[in-house]
Each structure stands twice: as C-alpha cells, then as structure tokens.
Amino acid sequence: MAKAQSKQATATNTPRLKQVYNETIRKALQEQFGYDNDMQVPRLDKIVLNMGVGEATADSKKPSVAAEDLALIAGQKAVVTRARNSIAGFKVRENMPIGAKVTLRKERMYEFLDRLVNIALPRVRDFRGLNPKSFDGRGNYAMGIKEHIVFPEINYDKVDQIWGMDVIVCTTAKTDDEARALLKAFNFPFRQ
C-alpha cells in the first residue's frame, strides 16, 4: 500500500516535460538515430541563465537587483558574477560585480523549460522563431532574450529597469543535428 502511494506521489511530482521525454521523446530519438543503448539518447544536461548588467560600473547595487529578478525567474538563488580582470575602456575593475547567473538542473530545469517555451517566448515582442543556427557544434544551444519581463514571475509594475539575458541549453548530444531534434521534440519554435 505504501509503495503504491509513494510511486503515485512521485509520478505526480515529476515535471510535465520530463514525463514527455521519458515516455515519448526518448523512444522517438532512439528510432530516428538508431541508438543501441538508452544511455546514448541525447537528454538535457543543464540550463544556464546569465544576466550581464552594463550599468554595474556606475551603480554597484544593480547586479544584486538583477540577481533577485533572476532568482524569481529561475526558482533558485542566483549568484552575482564578478569581473575576472580590469578593463579600463569599460571602467571595470577586477572583482567588481558585473552580472548574475543561475544553473538549473533536474526538475527545476524541466519546469523552467516548460515556462520558457509555452509562456515566455510567445510573449516576446516581434517573435518570429528561434535561430536554428545558434548551436555551438557540440550539441548546446544558446539564445538571448532582450527583455526579462516576458516571464510571468516578474511584476512589470515593480521593475525599475529592463535587462536582457542569455539562456544556454546544454545537452548530452554529440552533434547539432541530435540536439536540434531533441529541442524540436520539446517544442522549441525554430525559424524555418
């Protein structure tokens, strides 16, 4: 009795996209690419959200505000990133806070991906699809979002400044074609 209840509880707590991957996407990719082993099938590894704050040189509090917004979007605490070395042209000193980042894995990664594809991307102004050439050659995909207010967690009235952000989707795919097939299966809206 207890085992049946715990199994049912874990099934309901599993993110929707993770269930879709385990039930349909994995089998489809295995047939498409002819993998012998289940572990060869590409899967999502992590999603990194990065927010660079250019105004950090004038006001050192801006990166911490960006980190708070990023934490709301991601659902976990963001880390303030610091400059590795000084660049006089940008008025940046070594170890100065210049942005924020979050690395999402496991359940939070799937939950964020669901919100990104189904809620945030359709809310982007003049959105015509994602660039299908933004793969890095090793099965990872990077994209930029110009306004972080497209996420439902951000209250537009309380935002004092709009920042852009990078979203990097890392996969275990060996080639860009495998990664493209994986992300298309997750309903990424690539341009034709």
Curated annotation (Swiss-Prot):
Q: Which cysteines are joined by disulfide bonds?
A: none
Keywords attached to this entry: Ribonucleoprotein, Ribosomal protein, RNA-binding, rRNA-binding, tRNA-binding
Which Gene3D superfamilies does the UniProt entry name for this protein?
A: 3.30.1440.10
- According to its record, what are the GO cellular component terms? ribonucleoprotein complex; ribosome
Q: Name the domain of life.
A: Bacteria
Might you name a Gene Ontology BP term for this protein? translation
Q: Does the keyword RNA-binding apply?
A: yes
HAMAP family named among the record's database cross-references: Ribosomal_uL5_B (MF_01333_B)
Its function? This is one of the proteins that bind and probably mediate the attachment of the 5S RNA into the large ribosomal subunit, where it forms part of the central protuberance. In the 70S ribosome it contacts protein S13 of the 30S subunit (bridge B1b), connecting the 2 subunits; this bridge is implicated in subunit movement. Contacts the P site tRNA; the 5S rRNA and some of its associated proteins might help stabilize positioning of ribosome-bound tRNAs.
NCBIfam families per the UniProt record, alphabetical: PRK00010.1
Family of this protein: Belongs to the universal ribosomal protein uL5 family.
* Record's protein name: Large ribosomal subunit protein uL5
Which species is this UniProt entry from?
Answer: Mesorhizobium japonicum (strain LMG 29417 / CECT 9101 / MAFF 303099) (Mesorhizobium loti (strain MAFF 303099))
Gene it is expressed from: rplE
